[in-house]
Design a protein with these regions (language model features):
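An extended, acidic
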Residues: 177-178, 185, 190-198
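Conserved beta-loop-beta connector loops within the AMP-binding
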Residues: 168-175
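N-terminal beta1-alpha1 cap of cysteine-dependent amidohydrolase-like domains
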Residues: 1-105, 109, 116-120, 129-168, ...
Length: 250
């Protein structure tokens, strides 16, 4: 089985030939693919996504440091505009996988890309730790220090979510209540037609949706951090998604 994912852009300083702006594949997703013995193909340019779609069984749309420009969902654009518009490639890749009826899983910015592609909108939210605490000292977001599998200390921001039964999120947590990480400044506003909201935070922010007919799933948080933090529970999101991709390919 082979899964596709998208390259992401990171702006850096030009201290040497090895530094500066760079393109990267999300390391946690690479590690998870290795963990399950799944092939992973990274889509980097407009020139190869259709061919990759044909050879892959599903698509993981990762999060990104870059927010989708509001002009893509009918609102005033950023000022200044993004240096790089990743959504231009994201939307083409989503269209190709949609046309071929292949499963997709969007994570953080990935769920936002799916929502915008299928006709939904986004809104700015104060859901980052610093923003939330500045506006509300009793914020539902908690911070803890976690040590990852590489010995690094991670600032882990979490909050509670409410989960709909008979959903892909409930399939993992087996509960209507769970704590997940949270690292986003935008959230889903109007939900794209055909998608069911299956998890919300206590303040009403959409945390997950799905379209079972199209086999499309999305989380506003980062379940891929589970591998880095040695948490086997949320790895089941990927295990279950890979199973859906395998069954769909038959």
């Amino acid at each position: 089985m082979n899964i596709a994912t998208l390259i992401r852009y990171k702006k850096g300083t030009y201290d040497s030939i090895w530094n500066g702006n760079s393109w990267f594949a999300h390391g946690n997703i690479v590690d998870i693919a290795r963990h399950y013995g799944v092939g992973l193909t990274v889509i980097a340019t407009d020139g190869d996504y259709e061919k990759v779609c044909q050879m892959c069984d599903g698509l993981i749309i990762p999060g990104s440091p870059i927010n989708i420009d509001p002009s893509f969902y009918g609102q005033e654009p950023f000022d200044p505009r993004n240096e790089v518009e990743e959504y231009l490639l994201d939307s083409k890749v989503i269209a190709a996988f949609d046309k071929m009826g292949k499963p997709m899983f969007g994570i953080c910015g990935g769920i936002q890309a799916l929502n915008v592609f299928y006709g939904g909108t986004l809104e700015r939210v104060s859901n980052l730790k610093t923003d939330a605490l500045a506006e509300n000292p009793s914020s539902h977001i908690e911070e803890e220090q976690r040590v990852d599998r590489y010995g690094n200390t991670v600032e882990y921001h979490t909050h509670p979510i409410n989960i709909k039964k008979d959903s892909f999120v409930f399939d993992v947590f087996q509960s209507e209540r769970a704590r997940t990480n949270t690292y986003h400044g935008y959230a889903l506003d109007r939900i794209a037609s055909g998608f069911d909201v299956v998890a919300r935070s206590d303040d009403g922010i959409v945390e997950a949706f799905e379209c079972r007919e199209k086999k499309i799933y999305g989380t506003q948080w980062h379940p891929e951090l589970a591998y880095r933090l040695n948490d086997p529970l949320e790895l089941k999101f990927f295990e279950n998604f890979f199973r859906v991709c395998k069954e769909n390919a038959r």
